[in-house]
Regions:
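Bacterial Sec-dependent N-terminal signal peptides
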Residues: 1-26
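Auxiliary tRNA-acceptor-end handling modules of aminoacyl-tRNA synthetases
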Residues: 25-294
Length: 294
């Protein structure tokens, strides 16, 4: 009897200690690898700034230089290094190709100093004037700056931020494809040919090329005219405009005062910081940085 009881107790203990079939299956079942969540794609922020690869796509053709110029289908983008915001640049506008009766190709139409600026939402292109000045060490300097506020030539949306976060991407099409008068046919000559407006459907960017110190833009402008110099049946004038923008050197050339005894081109500047206690127009010689080529 005792042996039978002992046998039953041992059997019961083994039943408790032995894993069930379900437990064995769970024990030897292959563990699934942990699920790795894919990073969510970056979304554009509240200012409409998109991820870089959503703007400058794999289809982009890039021309590296002063600004990297990206071409994506029919859109053109400037990628402006942060180090060049605030730097002064010279923009020279010429008529590269002209309609018969207007003049000759290559004639200069406008020259202006520009400065690119950026805030948190936009990029501004300003026209800089040095006609009125005062040394920044003088108390009157702030008053001179406030009375010589720089006009905004164009305002751009920020499309993206560069891959290394040290540059800003803007779309440049509208600067050259809309009627920005400072970069197109001069207002004085528009009156001569009775130009009423620019035809956007016949105006477009031809080429944009970037070099280490400058960017060369060529664009076609078509203007509606009631008195065109040639092909009057079209009622329009088409021109190819050239805009050359070059970075000005940080170290300026030494100025030379103008003297009427020497026949030389010159320009005036009103200086409010002289010791004469009044503003005075000072004339300086026009100088060109001519350097021997290696």
């Amino acid at each position: 009897m005792m042996n039978r009881i002992s046998f039953l107790l041992i059997g019961f203990a083994l039943m408790i200690a032995s894993p069930t079939h379900a437990q064995l299956c769970k024990l030897f079942k292959k563990k699934k690898p942990p699920v790795i969540e894919k990073p969510k794609p970056k979304k554009e922020d509240k200012n409409g700034i998109k991820p870089y690869d959503k703007v400058i796509t794999e289809k982009a053709i890039t021309d590296k230089g002063l600004f990297d110029v990206h071409t994506v289908d029919d859109k053109f983008y400037y990628e402006i290094p942060d180090s060049l915001f605030g730097a002064e640049m010279l923009m020279v506008t010429r008529i590269a190709k002209t309609a018969s009766g207007i003049g000759f190709g290559g004639g200069k139409q406008n020259t202006q100093v520009l400065r690119w600026e950026r805030d948190s939402k936009k990029v501004l292109l300003r026209v800089v004037s040095h006609e009125v000045v005062a040394a920044d060490s003088l108390p009157i300097h702030e008053a001179v700056v406030n009375s010589n506020f720089e006009p905004i030539l164009y305002r751009f949306d920020i499309k993206s931020i560069g891959k290394d976060s040290t540059s800003t991407v803007i779309e440049i099409n509208k600067l050259f494809e809309t009627d920005v008068k400072a970069l197109g046919f001069p207002a004085s000559r528009r009156k001569t040919y009775k130009i009423s407006s620019m035809d956007k459907s016949r105006s477009f960017i031809n080429t944009l090329k970037s070099y280490p110190l400058n960017i060369e833009a060529r664009h076609i402008k078509t203007y509606n005219s009631s008195s065109p110099p040639s092909n009057s049946s079209t009622g329009s004038i088409s021109l190819e405009i050239s805009n050359s923008m070059i970075l000005l050197p940080k170290k300026q050339m030494k100025r030379r005062y103008f003297d009427q005894r020497v026949g030389w081109f010159s320009r005036g500047q009103t200086d409010y910081g002289l010791d004469v206690q009044e503003s005075k127009t000072v004339r300086y010689l026009d100088r060109w940085r001519l350097e021997i080529k290696d």
